[in-house]
Each structure stands twice: as C-alpha cells, then as structure tokens.
C-alpha cells in the first residue's frame, strides 16, 4: 500500500505546475528542443538538456513537492539528480554521440521520445486527468524517464546503455506504483524501460561489403 492515492498524486502535480507556471509549456518547448538537438547530432546540447530536466524533476518534484506525500520521494529525487549530474559529465567529455542515422534502433528511439512527449500527456488527458495535472517530459518523472530512454537510443552501445540504467529502473518503480494506483499506461513503463535497455545493448548488425 502507498501513503497516497491517484487523486492525491494528480492534485500534487496540479499544485506543482501552478507553483512553477508556465512549467508545462516550458516542458513542451524543452522536449521539442531536446528531440531536435539529438536527432540533428548536437549531442552535447541534447545531453545537457536531459541533464537539466533530470536534476529539475529530482529536486523540484520529488524532493520539494512529492516528498510531502511519499516518504521514498527524496530517494527517487536523489537518483534523478545523480542521473542529471552523470549526463552533464558525459556531455562535457563528449564521449556519447547522438544522431538519427535511420537505423532500426533510431526509429524506435524516435518513436519512444515522441510517445513520451505527445502520447503520454494525451493519454493522461483522455484518462480523465485535468490539464493542470497532465504529465510532460521535463516536468514529471514518468515521461521524463521514457523520453530520456528514447533519446539515448539514438546513440546505442554500452556507453549509452549505462546512462539508461537509472531511467530504466525508474520505469520499474513507476510501473509498480501505477499498478497499485490503477493507472494503466504507467503499468506499461517497465516493458518500455527493459526493452529500451536491451535494444541499446544489442550489437549493431554488420554491413557486408
């Protein structure tokens, strides 16, 4: 059992968005900018934008807001902040190259990122969540983790997979929470998280000369 229900969580989200208005609109713009930067090969910019969002969600949502309802929120928040710090460090080193190369992995990554940016808030709304509480990547943890997994698939390989571990772990925790709260689309997150991580680790097919 959790110390809150779905109604309390979405009420907290609405309060959070109102406190930092116009956060939802800024998150939408952030998502478009990050997706464009990653697909175009501006790896450092995209990684820094992901880092900023992860730190923001960890500090502003989990630690400053959600901790009032969930005793585990500060732990989750710390993990998001750590993920953001690692992303920023990797961006500074320039070791991970993001680019849309029309590989199967890239199409999946692009689809996952778009699903997080457009599909997640849309399904929230169609599920009866009022607009002030609708979750978007860059502002709320579930779509932020899903969006990050999609963006990082544009790199693939073990270096990108290492960056995907914490977001993938979050999808498992969020899926369990979604099951308890009866939020259907949250329950699918572990499948997406594990599949994205496995795809990142899958070797690229060799091109025959």
Where are these regions (language model features)?
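Short hydrophobic alpha-helical membrane-embedded segments
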Residues: 24-29, 51, 55, 138-144, ...
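Aromatic-anchored segments of alpha-helical transmembrane domains
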Residues: 52-60, 112-123, 168-179
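Loop-to-transmembrane alpha-helix initiation sites
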Residues: 71-77, 180-194
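Membrane-interfacial loop-to-transmembrane alpha-helix junctions, especially the N-terminal start
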Residues: 41-51, 102-109, 156-167
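Hydrophobic cores of alpha-helical transmembrane segments in multi-pass inner/ER membrane proteins
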Residues: 23-36, 78-93, 141-155, 189-204
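N-terminal topogenic module of multi-pass integral membrane proteins
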Residues: 1-68
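Membrane-proximal helix-loop-helix units in multi-pass membrane proteins
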Residues: 72-149
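Membrane-helix boundary connector in multi-pass membrane proteins
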Residues: 154-165, 172-186
């Amino acid at each position: 059992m959790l110390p809150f229900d779905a109604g309390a969580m979405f009420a907290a989200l609405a309060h959070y968005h109102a406190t930092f208005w116009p956060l939802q609109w800024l998150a939408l713009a952030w998502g478009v900018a990050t997706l464009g930067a990653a697909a175009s090969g501006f790896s450092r910019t995209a990684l820094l934008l992901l880092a900023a969002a992860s730190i923001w969600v960890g500090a502003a949502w989990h630690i400053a807001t959600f901790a009032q309802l969930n005793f585990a929120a500060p732990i989750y928040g710390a993990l998001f902040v750590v993920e953001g710090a690692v992303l920023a460090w990797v961006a500074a080193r320039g070791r991970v190259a993001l680019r849309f190369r029309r590989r199967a992995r890239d199409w999946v990554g692009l689809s996952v990122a778009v699903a997080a940016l457009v599909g997640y808030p849309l399904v929230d709304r169609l599920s009866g969540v009022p607009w002030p509480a609708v979750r978007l990547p860059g502002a709320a943890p579930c779509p932020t983790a899903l969006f990050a997994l999609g963006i990082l698939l544009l790199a693939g390989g073990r270096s990108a997979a290492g960056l995907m571990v914490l977001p993938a772990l979050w999808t498992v925790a969020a899926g369990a929470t979604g099951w308890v709260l009866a939020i259907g689309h949250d329950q699918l997150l572990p499948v997406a998280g594990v599949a994205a991580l496995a795809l990142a680790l899958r070797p690229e097919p060799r091109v025959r000369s």
